[in-house]
Swiss-Prot record:
Induction statement: Down-regulated upon Pseudomonas syringae pv. tomato strain DC3000 infection.
Protein name: Regulator of nonsense transcripts UPF3
Residues spanning the signal sequence: none
Pfam family of the protein (one): Smg4_UPF3
Organism whose genome encodes this protein: Arabidopsis thaliana (Mouse-ear cress)
Keywords annotated in UniProt: Cytoplasm, mRNA transport, Nonsense-mediated mRNA decay, Nucleus, Plant defense, RNA-binding, Transport
């Protein structure tokens, strides 16, 4: 059975925080200098909040020395510089192990003077410092080295040699001739190859049909045209055809000789307007070249006729206004201004190309002849009942105003039924659409329009009926008034 291990290591606790190892040993050595073999001191930490005491570990050689040390230091009082007292406590250490002293020494200890790396370092330090040359000197040295040294030959791999040989065979004289022949062949093929979009003039068939103004015009052609929705092309005054997506209306009141072309599928139909149905002197349909040459003359004649029609309407209105009394003239001007706002707008608004306006009346171009027949029937009918505002005065005043209103309503009916309004610029408008017209109007016409504009009253204020001081009266309009 083993003997119990003898405890030789003690710990001294509760030492002052400011105590050093030298001060502690000065208290121990006078009496126990030769009795201990190992000492370890752990300094403390002094602070206002947490104060940590110092401690010391001492390992004695014999257990008797432990008893004697405990009898001497246990309860020993230490006083610091501030007068605080600290009572020491001697105990057995929890761990009795003590580090063993190492007797082995490192063989390299004290041999740095013989180390080769250290000796080379000393030589480098002993050499004088050399400044680097300037940049110009360095460039000159490099240029001299590059010029003197021979350039290394480029490395050629077998793959590069094979590619060079292949290019030489392809780009030889025979290869170049083959390439040129191939280029010529492609050019010839592209020249002989037909274009994907053949011209419409070559592919389409043209027919010339003479349009008659009588009631017996065959409606089968108009029905076919309206059902298939063809693209109309109207020739303008310069002889150029309008785009295919625009439509041109067939106008009965247009002057003779104006050519209208209609494209339906692959066939092109040219409509010619004849002056008189029963005229035996009508020339046969001419080819398109002769018709194009006469377009400019016909357009100038149509412009003159349109200008004369507009001037005649304005003069007629002025004469009627002068004959009637001021009250009648004011009512006439108001009614005329309400009914014919399109004529005033024709002279104020800028002109627009005929092809864009004609495109709006695409669906009504086939039924214009029927509408004109209805107008002729309405003119032949007996008297119609009209109303006119009644003012204080003689009975003949309502009659004249009723006549004027009847004329105005005839104009409204003609505009709503598709009658063409001719502007001074020579363009045609249908269905009362007078948004775009020419501004070319003489000084006389502008003054007359200003007079008409002054007498105009707002439609919102009137409410579409007679005012509070007017009375409604039904009058019979004579058939000769039209």
């Amino acid at each position: 059975m083993k003997e119990p291990l003898q405890k030789k290591k003690v710990v001294v606790r509760h030492l002052p925080p400011s105590l050093s190892q030298s001060d502690l040993l000065s208290q121990i050595d006078p009496r126990f200098a030769d009795r201990y073999n190992w000492v370890s001191f752990r300094p403390g930490k002094s602070s206002y909040k947490n104060q940590k005491y110092s401690r010391a570990y001492v390992s004695f050689k014999a257990p008797e020395d432990v008893y004697e040390f405990a009898a001497f230091f246990n309860g020993h009082v230490f006083v610091n510089e501030k007068g605080a007292q600290f009572k020491a406590i001697v105990e057995y250490a929890p761990s009795q192990r003590v580090p063993k002293p190492s007797d082995k020494k490192d063989p390299r200890e004290g041999s740095i003077s013989k180390d080769p790396d250290y000796l080379e370092f000393l030589k480098v330090i002993a050499q004088p410092v050399e400044n680097l040359p300037s940049a110009e000197i360095q460039l000159e040295r490099r240029e001299a080295e590059q010029s003197g040294a021979s350039k290394a030959a480029p490395i050629v791999t077998p793959l590069m040699e094979f590619i060079r040989q292949k290019r030489a065979t392809v780009m030889g004289p025979q290869g170049l001739s083959d390439i040129r022949r191939g280029g010529r062949r492609t050019r010839v093929v592209s020249a002989n190859k037909p274009s994907p979009r053949p011209s419409k003039r070559n592919s389409e068939k043209k027919k010339y049909v003479e349009k008659e103004s009588s009631k017996n015009v065959p409606r089968k052609t108009t029905a076919d045209v309206s059902s298939s929705k063809p693209d109309y092309r109207q020739s303008n005054s310069s002889g150029k055809e309008l785009p295919g997506n625009e439509t041109a209306a067939i106008i009965d009141s247009s002057p003779p000789g104006i050519a209208l072309t209609m494209d339906s599928g692959k066939k092109k139909i040219l409509l010619l307007r004849s002056k008189d149905r029963d005229n035996p002197d009508n020339p046969p349909p001419q080819p398109e070249q002769h018709i194009d040459t006469n377009l400019s003359r016909n357009s100038t004649d149509s412009r003159q006729n349109q200008k004369s029609d507009v001037g005649g309407r304005l003069i007629k209105g002025i004469l009627l206004r002068n004959d009637s009394r001021p009250s009648q003239s004011s009512t006439f001007v108001q009614s005329e201004q309400r009914v014919e706002p399109s004529e005033a707008e024709n002279y104020k608004r800028p002109s627009r190309p005929a092809n864009t306006r004609a495109g709006k009346d695409y669906h009504t171009s086939g039924t214009i002849s029927e509408k004109q027949e209805r107008r002729t029937r309405n003119k032949d009918r007996p008297d119609r009942v009209m109303w006119a505002p009644r003012r204080d005065g003689s009975e003949d005043q309502p009659l004249s105003s009723a006549g004027n209103n009847g004329e105005v309503k005839d104009r409204m009916f003609s505009q709503r039924s598709g009658e063409v309004v001719n502007s001074s610029g020579g363009h045609t408008l249908e269905n009362g659409s007078a948004r775009h017209s020419s501004r070319r109007v003489g000084g006389r016409n502008r003054k007359e329009e200003v007079v008409i504009g002054e007498g105009k009253t707002s439609r919102r204020g009137s409410g579409g009926g007679p005012s509070s001081h007017e009375k409604q009266m039904w009058i019979q309009k004579p058939s000769s008034g039209t």
